[in-house]
Amino acid sequence: MSVMFDPDTAIYPFPPKPTPLSIDEKAYYREKIKRLLKERNAVMVAHYYTDPEIQQLAEETGGCISDSLEMARFGAKHPASTLLVAGVRFMGETAKILSPEKTILMPTLQAECSLDLGCPVEEFNAFCDAHPDRTVVVYANTSAAVKARADWVVTSSIAVELIDHLDSLGEKIIWAPDKHLGRYVQKQTGGDILCWQGACIVHDEFKTQALTRLQEEYPDAAILVHPESPQAIVDMADAVGSTSQLIAAAKTLPHQRLIVATDRGIFYKMQQAVPDKELLEAPTAGEGATCRSCAHCPWMAMNDLQAIAEALEQEGSNHEVHVDERLRERALVPLNRMLDFAATLRG
């Protein structure tokens, strides 16, 4: 079947980088945010890919730094009446779907995700309609509208286990939106998977030849790879996994030097986990080429201290996440299935 929208050829305009803050400005906004969090009965929920100073602030204020699955769990269970989600838009939507009674704020509602942008709901609905015999599994990196069409939502940390489970039931799968993660899961499980053709603009840029040269330069290094990366990069890995799984692998691998193929925002928590190990960025620019993302999501970078302070101070349409109630109820069903399934895996 042909699909009118082609994620492979889509070019997403990057947002402007936030204006760098001085040391004094950073100190001012840090103290202001801490005060506003207390006044608003709010807690910060930050993704591993946000900048280190944002993750540090979340730690210092009793918040959460995690992958998207744990962000969802933490936000739903925390008693705070307001969640400040430092991440990208779908993460704020997911928080609102799971916690409709809470106020969900984001530093900016313009923080997108190329996987989300690469899966427009109208085209995706048509794709699903053309394959009515397939169970629809969508990655967490999708809009509320796409989640509402799905049977299951999944994160990379439990993707293999879920598809293995569905395959054991004889179910055929539509997987969206990440083609690389879909192919990785298919290879691991042998499941019958029909993939949407989206990709993460960060992980899609990792280059095999450049990584090979870096490996030759550091032959004692282990390679850690997120499965949103191209198959050729995954094939070079000593460990493959979600952000939380890569941090765990960094601790268990005996190597003292690690080449990391995911967004460099992860280095903050990974270095905490292995303070005695050297972390190297996997290359995103090939021979004679330049990188666009350069191993850091440009939309994650929009979560700066000034924007967080403004979100807590101003609230309003520029910062508060809203999800249509009927859409929220439909999207909640596959999200709850994911959380229930994840709970069974934890025993």
Curated annotation (Swiss-Prot):
Its EC number is 2.5.1.72. [4Fe-4S] cluster binds at C113, C200, C297. Its main location: cytoplasm. Iminosuccinate binds at H47, S68, Y139, A140, N141, S156, H226, P227, E228, T243. Pathway: Cofactor biosynthesis; NAD(+) biosynthesis; quinolinate from iminoaspartate: step 1/1. GO terms for biological process: 'de novo' NAD biosynthetic process from L-aspartate. Its cofactor is [4Fe-4S] cluster. GO terms for cellular component: cytosol. Binds 1 [4Fe-4S] cluster per subunit. It is found in: Cytoplasm. Belongs to the quinolinate synthase family. Type 1 subfamily. Catalyzes the condensation of iminoaspartate with dihydroxyacetone phosphate to form quinolinate. NCBIfam families: nadA, PRK09375.1-1, PRK09375.1-2. HAMAP family: NadA_type1. This is Quinolinate synthase. It comes from Shigella boydii serotype 4 (strain Sb227).
